[in-house]
Amino acid sequence: RPDTKIILTEPANSAILASGYINTRNEAHQPTESHPAFEPHPIQGWTPDFIPFVLQEAVDGSYYDELLPVAGPDGISWSRRLAAEEGIFTGISGGSTFAIAMKVAETAPKGSVLLVMLPDTGERYLSTPLFEGIDEEMTDEETAISQSTPSAQMVSG
């Protein structure tokens, strides 16, 4: 589609692309320093403390149309909502991607098509802030629901 737009996103508090600073690299294109704009953030798998060479090439070639920041708590919130409301079990990065998609959808022209990839699963984040405050054991009500479906029973304890 000729009207395709590519939107990049990065953690709002670790805006290394938005900073405009380019990592120095060795002959193998590996970064030789930590990016000065890097800050710790909860979006695991995103934004290490350097710009990967393949990403720098894409930035240099202007292979994207827009760069939008996303706050870590928004990613966590959307990841939880996707699980609870849609049955999509994704990690914080998937929730963060979806948060930006929802932001873009708010102003997209009527009839626009948005393709959003959530190449992640929530399973690997069970011990992270994503699941903070969620009990490990099923409630009596959840156990009853589980037992009402003989082919998919969960045993607690």
Where are these regions (language model features)?
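Active-site/ligand-binding loops adjacent to catalytic centers
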Residues: R1-T90, P129-G157
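Residue-level recognition of the N-termini of beta-strands and the immediately preceding loop/turn
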Residues: T4-K5, S112-L114
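Structural signature of the thiamine diphosphate
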Residues: F98-V113
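Short Gly/Pro-enriched loop/turn and capping motifs at secondary-structure junctions
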Residues: P73-G75, G95, G122-E123
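Short beta-strand segments
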Residues: L8-E10, L115-P119
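Short glycine/serine/threonine-rich phosphate/pyrophosphate-binding segments
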Residues: I16-L17, S93-A101, Y125
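Short, mixed-charge aromatic SLiMs
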Residues: L118-L130
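Helix N-cap / loop-to-helix initiation motif
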Residues: F89-S93, K110
